[in-house]
Amino acid sequence: MVRSNDVKFQVYDAELTHFDLESNNNLQYSLSLNLSIRNSKSSIGIHYDRFEATVYYMNQRLGAVPMPLFYLGSKNTMLLRALFEGQTLVLLKGNERKKFEDDQKTGVYRIDVKLSINFRVMVLHLVTWPMKPVVRCHLKIPLALGSSNSTGGHKKMLLIGQLVKDTSANLREASETDHRRDVAQSKKIADAKLAKDFEAALKEFQKAQHITVERETSYIPFDPKGSFSSSEVDIGYDRSQEQRVLMESRRQEIVLLDNEISLNEARIEAREQGIQEVKHQISEVMEMFKDLAVMVDHQGTIDDIDEKIDNLRSAAAQGKSHLVKASNTQGSNSSLLFSCSLLLFFFLSGDLCRCVCVGSENPRLNPTRRKAWCEEEDEEQRKKQQKKKTMSEKRRREEKKVNKPNGFVFCVLGHK
């Protein structure tokens, strides 16, 4: 009528928050189980008159919890929660002690759950006689993150995560301080080395976390087989164990993500610091190029001014020499003109005296002689005029030679 696969018992969630064996062999524990009972039949209902859950470790009883009575209808599911906590005396032998130490190292404990049940099956309006099956679940429960005796528990992960955040904040403050110009270069180098060392340590920690997750997920839950009609029915805990391991893995992945976020923030801060330094250096180089361009432009103007000053200086020196030469030439021309005028005056005075003397001579003088004398005088006067004309032309040529350099100098000075 009722087969073992018609009613399914499943531990879909388990949380072991405390599991510590003291030196006096007292085992302190705290375990919570979430159970689901599924009636897959559409024609029967089940009355549960007794339901008790008992936990065992190394075949030694830890504690038992009675569950409330209930009726499970057709194609229906009942969810139950059982809490086991307290302490009990546990005597472990040599091999069992070694297994406990192995469980303590890995953080995963092999715990058995026994369900003692009395139920009656109702078909239509008929109720059968009581049945007393026993259901056993073989569990491998990892010690919950955050437990007091967990070697790789959540408290340590949270502490490490907080240390990562604090270190990232300190590195961020150090990077902001390094932006100042008054900070020594040695301090900047030390802060950069510290950031690299922190990044390497964080990568090692993340690698260790991944290894821990792989070890925890490597445990394969026990898949029990049995008959519901026999005295003991072992129901596997494959799905619940997978869900539990997945939950623990997700929690650890969240911590890993937090650490990666902190690491990425530190990387971003370091990159921003490097970008700001590069921007500052680029701006300084641009300012240097601007100053250099202005200097080059001004240098061309200065060279033009120097060249013009040199040309003006040479032109002024040349003009000065021409002026001195013209002054000397003008002085000599004036003295020459004065001398010529004086000689002309003397000649004219001599001719006048001679004419007076000739006019006053004796009229009985020989006419032939007087004619010859007059001819001589005319010839002499003609020579004098020719000489005067030659001297006048020579003086004009010299004046032209003197006036040409003076005009060039004046034009150059006027242009400048």
From Swiss-Prot:
Q: What does this protein do?
A: Vesicle trafficking protein that functions in the secretory pathway.
- From the Swiss-Prot or TrEMBL record, give the protein name: Putative syntaxin-24
Q: Per the database entry, which stretches of residues form a coiled coil?
A: 374-404
InterPro entries linked: LEA_2 (IPR004864), SNARE (IPR010989), Syntaxin (IPR045242), Syntaxin_N (IPR006011), T_SNARE_dom (IPR000727)
Q: How does it assemble?
A: Part of the t-SNARE complex.
Q: Which UniProt keywords apply?
A: Coiled coil, Protein transport, Transport
* Location of region: Disordered: 375-401
Q: Which Pfam families match?
A: LEA_2, SNARE, Syntaxin_2
Family membership noted in the UniProt record: Belongs to the syntaxin family.
Q: Where is the t-SNARE coiled-coil homology domain?
A: 265-326
Per the UniProt entry, what is one GO biological process?
vesicle-mediated transport
State any GO CC term: membrane
- The encoding gene: SYP24
Compositionally skewed regions (Basic and acidic residues) per UniProt? 390-401
Q: Which domain of life is it from?
A: Eukaryota
